[in-house]
Amino acid sequence: MSENDGIHIEYVDEQELKREFRRFMSDPETREKAANYLYESLVDETILGIAYEVHHANKTGSGAAVEGEPEDSKPYTIVDQPDTDVFGSSNTKKAIDCHCPNCNRIVAASRFAPHLEKCMGMGRNSSRIASRRIANTRDVGTGNYFGGDEDDEDDADWSGEKRKKKISQVRTNGSKKNGKTS
């Protein structure tokens, strides 16, 4: 490999590189070739870079993002009304309403589950309330929840006797079954 091939030349030190550079730059023909080479390389790289960017923008659809959205021809008007922002949009939060399938009432979404539970009588207190209703309707009216007096004469036979009180059992540790000590 000779020095003039231009493929790869190694220099011993920096001083030798500087001497070789000065020797090439002292010749006007070599300077012109080097300047033309640098100029053409810069122009080629710039054109190729722009071509790749345009191609990529068209392929990915990001060309509109580079160009931006066209400006509106009419200027924005500032709206000064209650419950609206400066552009006229409503700024109040609208609660989502649900329709109760049981009573056909409109209930806020945040209250729908508790409403439905009470409306259908499925809540935790519903069994107590139902027991109270049964007791109240039994006391009022005919005396029988189901509406008939025909079973009243049979009730005296089995419910007339007083029940005997259970004797509480004492455990081996001296405490009663309900937890109280004797």
Swiss-Prot record:
Disulfide linkage: none
Gene3D superfamilies according to UniProt: Classic Zinc Finger (3.30.160.60)
Compartments where found: Nucleus
Pfam families: Sgf11
A single GO cellular-component term on record: DUBm complex
Ranges for region Disordered: 61-84, 133-182
Any one Gene Ontology BP term: chromatin organization
Span of zinc fingers (SGF11-type): 98-119
Biased composition (Acidic residues): 148-158
Molecular function via GO: transcription coactivator activity; zinc ion binding
Subunit record text: Component of some SAGA transcription coactivator-HAT complexes. Within the SAGA complex, participates in a subcomplex of SAGA called the DUB module (deubiquitination module).
PANTHER family hit by this protein: ATAXIN-7-LIKE PROTEIN 3
Family under the similarity heading: Belongs to the SGF11 family.
Main function: Component of the transcription regulatory histone acetylation (HAT) complex SAGA, a multiprotein complex that activates transcription by remodeling chromatin and mediating histone acetylation and deubiquitination. Within the SAGA complex, participates in a subcomplex that specifically deubiquitinates histone H2B. The SAGA complex is recruited to specific gene promoters by activators, where it is required for transcription.
Protein name stated in the entry: SAGA-associated factor 11 homolog
Organism of origin: Anopheles gambiae (African malaria mosquito)
Gene from which the chain derives: Sgf11
